Amino acid sequence: MDLNYKLRGFPKVHFFNLDNRKDRRNWMVEQFECFDIEYERISGTKYLASESSKWKHLIKDIDDYKLLVPIAANAISHLDFLKTWYKESTDPYVVLMEDDYDLRLVDYWTFDWHTIIERLPYDWDCLLMGFENPDGIRFHLHPIEPAHDFGPVLLKRSFVEKILDLHCVGDKYKLVNTVANAAWNRQADVAGSGTVDYFMVHTGRTYCLPLITVNANFGSFENNSIIQKFYRSEGDILARNTYYYYWQHECDRYSLDEFFSYGTSKHNDMILKPRKFRTYDMTGKSYKLYGESYLDYFRKS
């Protein structure tokens, strides 16, 4: 295990970024260079939500598609990239990221990338390396849960082939499919098979590890909209705070065997409720000032 260079062997990252979001692009590039990660920027401008008239004909089942236009644009952008990657590359894996992830938790990992790959169950299709779940975040390896959504992922080539088979028909995209997962078939405008939050992680054997969180300071879509401001404040900020709390103060309480497994009563103690961490100070200043009594507040609340 090489804790001096934890990301040795980490695959090339393909990250999606709109041309006008230089703030997000610069944020990601600075992190990649800091951690010596090979990367490729994928422009999301080919399928802009504001220019849907140029590409909506590519959705084979457009008459039945009810999700928000930016969600469709994002879905097609990812599928378009995967088609190209699958055709032009022979790599066994591919790593995908959006442009708002916070990689600084790597500094707190107690293992390296080789250990992660070595510990993955042999039947995996997808490794979800970061996720938000308001019902509770499991800080250990586990199969994907119903309310998990898209995050930084490592995909096997065979799984990419399956995704393309399910959602690509010639030059068009089939985005309306039957979904039995109640977390993803209730809200017609934001949930369903036609969002990357579902089809990229819920259509195969996905295992999850809480390794990477979000930078909650960025809005999404083509600008920092008020809708995304509300979403970020109520979702991503809580998740980010919870991730930082675990990696800064809780990870040493559990062994690697416990972190890379699931299914015991011990693992129930490794679930944290994001709503408890609304006021958590990830800078460490409050902990430095109040010591263990500061942590006791979150452990007991």
Task: Describe each PLM feature range.
Residues 1-97, 101-301:
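An acidic/histidine-cluster motif and surrounding catalytic segment
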